[in-house]
Design a protein with these regions (language model features):
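Long, low-complexity segments enriched in small/aliphatic residues
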Residues: 132-217
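Glycine-rich, flexible beta-strand/loop modules in the N-terminal catalytic cores of phosphate-handling
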Residues: 2-6, 204-227
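Short beta-strand segments
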Residues: 69-70, 214
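Conserved small/polar residues in nucleotide/adenosyl-binding loops
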Residues: 234-238
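Core beta-strand elements of the Rossmann-like FAD/NAD(P) dinucleotide-binding domain
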Residues: 57-66
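Short, hydrophobic/aromatic-rich segments at coil-to-beta transitions
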Residues: 48-53
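Conserved N-terminal/central alpha/beta ligand/cofactor-binding core
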Residues: 1-36, 58, 70-90, 94, ...
Length: 238
């Protein structure tokens, strides 16, 4: 699958959007956790409930004619690593409870989707000399239709590398403990970015799979190993 892709500085991206939101006129921010959707009755002729706001973990109620859910991986999220698991939306952040239950109580059906993430790499432990640099476009296209264009700052390259038979053999030894294969996880994974376990199982005839080392930002040594998302035990992926 071919598509445009932007590699962003994770910290600066977050800081820029916070700055934008905090400087948007008539927009007020409240840091809390939504735990319940509040409903009221529509006009009698329709007879169906209508959302009227939310209640937060701190007990504050916000009234609204419309509630937009941008929940990501947090609604009743569970994180797996081998046979171990813990509630959470991502490492270090709690799962969110209450919103799903509110929807189910109103007759909505809830299901589960799954996604994975690779272990991050320390740039100080990477031998970049054996990797193939992947540079960004000199004149990149935009994702938006906005005519407002800013000059591209000095870009950092990504790097291309491939798995090997040795890597495949190590990972296959952990298939018995992998939630993907022992029945713990039954959700369907993302179609265009399968986990490394899915790739080894589905494309068992392939001797290698390409991986991209992507810098997470200018202020960190962390590299994201794109193409190596996994739910195997940490000692196997490292």
């Amino acid at each position: 699958m071919w598509s445009p892709r932007a590699q962003c500085d994770k910290s600066r991206f977050s800081a820029e959007w916070r700055r934008t939101l905090e400087n948007t006129p008539n927009l007020y921010l409240w840091q809390d956790t939504a735990v319940e959707l509040l409903f009221g009755q529509r006009p009698a002729e329709e007879g169906r409930p209508q959302v009227r706001g939310i209640r937060t973990q701190m007990g504050v109620e916000f009234s609204a004619d419309c509630v937009i859910l941008t929940a990501g991986t947090f609604l009743a999220g569970v994180m797996y690593c081998g046979r171990s698991h813990a509630e959470g939306g991502r490492a270090g952040d709690s799962a969110s409870h209450g919103v799903t239950e509110s929807l189910v109580a109103m007759g909505f059906e809830a299901g589960r989707m799954k996604t994975g993430t690779p272990a991050r790499l320390d740039a100080r432990t990477i031998n970049f000399e054996i990797l193939e640099p992947q540079y960004g476009d000199e004149n990149p296209s935009k994702f938006s239709f906005s005519a407002d264009t800013h000059p591209v700052q000095n870009q950092l390259p990504c790097f291309l590398v491939y798995t090997s038979k040795k890597v495949h053999d190590i990972l296959r030894k952990g298939f018995g403990d992998s939630p993907l294969f022992n029945g713990t996880i039954r959700g369907i994974g993302p179609r265009y970015c399968p986990s490394i376990e899915d790739k080894l199982n589905t494309f068992a005839d392939k001797d290698q799979h390409q991986l991209f080392l992507e810098p997470e930002g200018r202020s960190t040594n962390e590299y994201y190993l794109n193409g190596f998302s996994s739910v195997s035990y940490t000692h196997l992926t490292l």
